[in-house]
Amino acid sequence: MAMKNTSHVLLLSLLLCLMFVIGLVEASIPDDDMGPAIYTPPSGSCGAPISKYDFQVLAKRPPPCRRPRLENTEDVTHTTRP
């Protein structure tokens, strides 16, 4: 066997280098599929779901972030830490 004297570290480093070069070549190839389209919600919607048919629904109800927060009735003035 001719490869008996070649160390495994050298072979693994060559394999890693080859994978890196293949990754760079694939990344440089232009692709028309850019993945799913991400739409930003309109300002003030607080992350409410948006679709073509939800605009009328969103206009009729307030966004979820405008709900009043529940009051904490528990007394939290004391602490258990020393």
From Swiss-Prot:
GO terms for molecular function: LRR domain binding; receptor serine/threonine kinase binding. A motif (SCOOP motif) lies at residues 43-55. Its main location: membrane. It is found in: Cell membrane; Secreted, Extracellular space, Apoplast; Endoplasmic reticulum; Golgi apparatus. Residues 61-82 are annotated as: Disordered. Residues 68-82 have a biased composition (Basic and acidic residues). Induction: Induced by pathogenic bacteria Pseudomonas syringae pv. tomato (Pst) DC3000, jasmonate (MeJA), ethylene (ET) and salicylic acid (SA), mainly in shoots. Induced by increased levels of photorespiratory hydrogen peroxide H(2)O(2). Up-regulated by heat stress. Strongly induced by the necrotrophic fungus Botrytis cinerea, both in locally and systemically infected leaves. GO terms for biological process: defense response to fungus; defense response to other organism; response to bacterium; response to ethylene; response to external biotic stimulus; response to fungus; response to heat; response to hydrogen peroxide. It comes from the Eukaryota. A motif (SxS motif essential for MIK2 binding) lies at residues 43-45. Residues 28-42 form a propeptide. Keywords: Apoplast, Cell membrane, Cleavage on pair of basic residues, Endoplasmic reticulum, Golgi apparatus, Membrane, Plant defense, Secreted, Signal. Mostly expressed in stems and siliques, and, to a lower extent, in roots, leaves, seeds and flowers. Mainly observed in young and mature trichomes, hydathodes, the shoot apical meristem (SAM), leaf primordia, hypocotyls, stomatal guard cells and emerging lateral roots. GO terms for cellular component: apoplast; endoplasmic reticulum; Golgi apparatus; plasma membrane. Transmembrane segments: none annotated. Interacts with MIK2 (via extracellular leucine-rich repeat domain); this interaction triggers the formation of complex between MIK2 and the BAK1/SERK3 and SERK4 coreceptors, and subsequent BAK1 activation by phosphorylation. Brassicaceae-specific phytocytokine (plant endogenous peptide released into the apoplast) perceived by MIK2 in a BAK1/SERK3 and SERK4 coreceptors-dependent manner, that modulates various physiological and antimicrobial processes including growth prevention and reactive oxygen species (ROS) response regulation. Inhibits the fungal growth of Alternaria brassicicola, Sclerotinia sclerotiorum, Fusarium graminearum, yeast (Saccharomyces) and Botrytis cinerea, thus being an antimicrobial peptide (AMP). Prevents global growth and development. Belongs to the serine rich endogenous peptide (SCOOP) phytocytokine family. This is Secreted transmembrane peptide 9.
